[in-house]
Swiss-Prot record:
Subunit structure: Component of the 30S ribosomal translation pre-initiation complex which assembles on the 30S ribosome in the order IF-2 and IF-3, IF-1 and N-formylmethionyl-tRNA(fMet); mRNA recruitment can occur at any time during PIC assembly.
Claim: RNA-binding is one of the keywords in the record: yes
Name of the protein in its database record: Translation initiation factor IF-1
Protein purpose: One of the essential components for the initiation of protein synthesis. Stabilizes the binding of IF-2 and IF-3 on the 30S subunit to which N-formylmethionyl-tRNA(fMet) subsequently binds. Helps modulate mRNA selection, yielding the 30S pre-initiation complex (PIC). Upon addition of the 50S ribosomal subunit IF-1, IF-2 and IF-3 are released leaving the mature 70S translation initiation complex.
Keywords assigned by UniProt, alphabetized: Cytoplasm, Initiation factor, Protein biosynthesis, RNA-binding, rRNA-binding
Pfam families in the cross-refs: eIF-1a
Length: 72
């Protein structure tokens, strides 16, 4: 699957789950479960409740995503 097929959306972290999973509320008020991308995990980027993040979704399953960027 190529990068062009993924959907990027902005959201806010509303809950922290075990195993570096997060519940994120997107701009369109949908709630998805997201995990941290490998580069963020490698660089020890900390994500807390209330952080604004960019989530990458696949068109096949819109309930799961990957956090690829944390805004300040």
């Amino acid at each position: 699957m190529s990068k062009e097929e993924n959907i990027e959306m902005q959201g806010v972290v509303i809950d922290t789950l075990p195993n570096t999973m997060f519940r994120v509320e997107l701009e369109n008020k949908h709630i998805v479960t997201a995990h941290i991308s490998g580069k963020m995990r490698k660089n020890y980027i900390r994500i807390l409740t209330g952080d604004k993040v960019t989530v990458e979704l696949t068109p096949y399953d819109l309930t799961k995503g990957r956090i690829i960027f944390r805004s300040r």
